[in-house]
């Protein structure tokens, strides 16, 4: 029974670790033939429309106004700002691996916001995050950190927005189930398309086949599947656990680079992979391996009863 209860958790984490880890590489392919804000907007609009149509055909109804607006706000924070900044940065020639490294700061910001919101955090989570960040540094110590610094700043801003949205999203009422993801993607898509028009983005030529395939992959797998998995996590587990994917994503990005891009890894970088996986185990399984001890409140007798 215990294993069956954990299946949704493991499935959601797998979607985030593997699918989102590959999106950095796919975004880089897409922005070669799409303007960045436009590509992100098309991605989320397509995903949101498809998911909403599916839900409405299945008999689901639109949520009340308050949860709907809450979901739109979370979509703005997580997708329009969080993911949009990554897309713009990669268009500015920030390497996908560097993008993944900067996004790895999300769990650190998440724990900080968690403390501000009064959410209890475990010492083991802090230890896991510290080890994970150390692994990220090791992973890139032998690489070429020649990415655009302004692009890195954009990703950092997106990471802060994503972390705040993750914590805030766990404290407010959101639509039930996949309806939350549909509204968030629609809202983000609209905002990104407006931003694209304001920025004066235009298609100078028809995107290539790889560009269309990249948007399709990002819409279906990177948005509909992975984002709904993420929303499941932030509603059901601690924010630190929900953002632990940030440790695995750089690993997946590096493996894609070695497998498809002809890159090589040094010994210290391979060692870093093991350190990062260990950190993920601490963050994701620590609450089950080392559950918090229940606090027994002392019994205080009422003086009037004596």
Curated annotation (Swiss-Prot):
Where does this chain mainly localize?
A: membrane
Q: Which is a Pfam family this sequence falls into?
A: EamA
Location within or outside the cell = Cell inner membrane
Q: Does the keyword DNA-binding apply?
A: no
Q: How does it sit in the membrane?
A: Multi-pass membrane protein
GO BP, sorted A to Z: response to toxic substance
Q: Which residues lie on this side of the membrane: Cytoplasmic?
A: 1-6, 58-67, 115-125, 170-173, 228-239, 291-306
* SUPFAM superfamilies, alphabetized: Multidrug resistance efflux transporter EmrE (SSF103481)
Nucleotide-binding is among the record's keywords: no
- What residue intervals traverse the membrane? 7-27, 37-57, 68-88, 94-114, 126-146, 149-169, 174-194, 207-227, 240-260, 270-290
Topology check: give the Periplasmic ranges: 28-36, 89-93, 147-148, 195-206, 261-269
Instruction: Cite the InterPro entries for this sequence.
Output: AA-Vitamin_Transporters, CO/AA/NH_transpt, EamA_dom
Q: For this UniProt record, give its keywords in alphabetical order, as a comma-separated list.
A: Cell inner membrane, Cell membrane, Membrane, Repeat, Transmembrane, Transmembrane helix, Transport
Q: Which residues form the EamA domain?
A: 18-141, 160-285
Please give the superkingdom of this protein's source: Bacteria
* CC per GO annotation: plasma membrane
Q: Which family does it belong to?
A: Belongs to the EamA transporter family.
Stated name of the protein: Uncharacterized inner membrane transporter YedA
Organism the protein comes from? Escherichia coli (strain K12)
Q: Which gene encodes it?
A: yedA
């Amino acid at each position: 029974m215990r294993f069956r209860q954990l299946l949704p958790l493991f499935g959601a984490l797998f979607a985030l670790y593997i699918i989102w880890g590959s999106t950095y590489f796919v975004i880089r392919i897409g922005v070669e033939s799409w303007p960045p804000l436009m590509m992100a907007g098309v991605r989320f609009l397509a995903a949101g429309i498809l998911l909403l149509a599916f839900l409405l055909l299945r008999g689901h109804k639109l949520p009340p106004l308050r949860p709907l607006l809450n979901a739109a706000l979370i979509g703005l924070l997580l997708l329009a700002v969080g993911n949009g900044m990554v897309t713009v940065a990669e268009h500015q020639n920030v390497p996908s691996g560097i993008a993944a490294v900067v996004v790895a700061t999300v769990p650190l910001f998440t724990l900080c916001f968690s403390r501000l919101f009064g959410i209890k955090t475990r010492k083991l989570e802090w230890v896991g995050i510290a080890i994970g960040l150390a692994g990220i540094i090791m992973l890139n110590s032998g690489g070429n950190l020649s990415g655009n610094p302004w692009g890195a700043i954009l990703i950092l801003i997106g990471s802060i927005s994503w972390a705040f949205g993750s914590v805030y999203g766990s404290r407010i009422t959101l639509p039930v189930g996949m309806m939350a993801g549909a509204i968030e993607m629609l809202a983000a898509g609209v905002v990104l398309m407006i931003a694209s028009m304001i920025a004066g983005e235009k298609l100078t030529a028809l995107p290539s086949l790889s560009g269309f395939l990249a948007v399709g992959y990002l819409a279906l797998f990177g948005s509909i599947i992975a984002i709904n998995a993420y929303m499941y996590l932030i509603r059901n587990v601690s924010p630190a656990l929900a953002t632990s994917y940030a440790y695995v994503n750089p690993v997946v990005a590096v493996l894609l680079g070695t497998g498809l891009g002809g890159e090589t890894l040094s010994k210290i970088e391979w060692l870093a992979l093991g350190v990062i996986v260990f950190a993920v185990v601490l963050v994701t399984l620590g609450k089950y391996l080392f559950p918090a001890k229940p606090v027994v409140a002392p019994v205080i007798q009422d003086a009037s009863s004596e």
